[in-house]
Amino acid sequence: MLSAIVEQISNNGYGIFKGFYDISTIEKFSELCEKHSINRPFTKANGRKIMVKSAKNLVAKTRDFDDFFSDSRLIAILERILSPVGHWGIKISDTGIKNVVAGLRAPLMHRDDDLYPQLARGTPFTVKSLLAIDAFSEEVGATKVVPGSHNWVRAVDPSEKAVSVLLDPGDLLVMDGRLWHQAGENIRSDKVRRAVNVYYCAGWCQPGHGIHCGMPEGEFSQLPSKIKTFL
């Protein structure tokens, strides 16, 4: 299973791990998403502001998601893609709860590796993983990707065909940081599209939230080893 997903990512820039977690586990994660999400301002398609429940830098605020962030199956995939160098390993760059609601402005196509000033060659600097809490469909704003674009050195062309990634709750989407992608637009006022996001980088790169994801040294020193090793 893991080798097949790594091959998907190598060939297409993204891979899907079907049924990464069962429904009972996802129901627990759904409750945790409600617990840790707060209202944040986002922009609607019409330019007006909207308050959306989401969360940023989860790993610095709670231990409730550590089992996912450090899941051995996920780490095995990430290490195959990021090819860690020596003692540097891989590090958590960002974690959060994504929530695509009706009317939310869809972001532009982008590459996560563009956080850094030079595009990676051979292996990416980063890998993003999205755990579907709700179903991903076109009408609720499923993530859109341009297959194979992780091999490009050029920018994406607006005419390029993007594919919506359809997921069931519990499925895991893993994306090479060089892949051009964006969240879709949710046109269903009665549904949301939530996902727990974890974004890893090569250990020698600067993480998005800085060393230890911004945690004070005292808090960091008390972390369980299963998550501490990735911070």
Residue ranges and their predicted role:
Residues L115, L173, R178-Q182:
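Histidine-centered metal-chelating micro-motifs
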Residues G47, L179, G184-L231:
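Non-heme Fe(II)/2-oxoglutarate
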Residues L104-L167, C205-M215:
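Catalytic core of non-heme Fe(II) oxygenases with the double-stranded beta-helix
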Residues M1-N12, F17-M109, L115-Y116:
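Non-heme Fe(II)-dependent double-stranded beta-helix
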Residues D94-I97, S129-L131, V196-Y200:
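A structural signal for short, well-ordered beta-strand segments
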Residues K98, A135-F136, R178-L179:
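Short Ser/Thr-interspersed hydrophobic loop/turn segments at strand-loop and sheet-helix junctions
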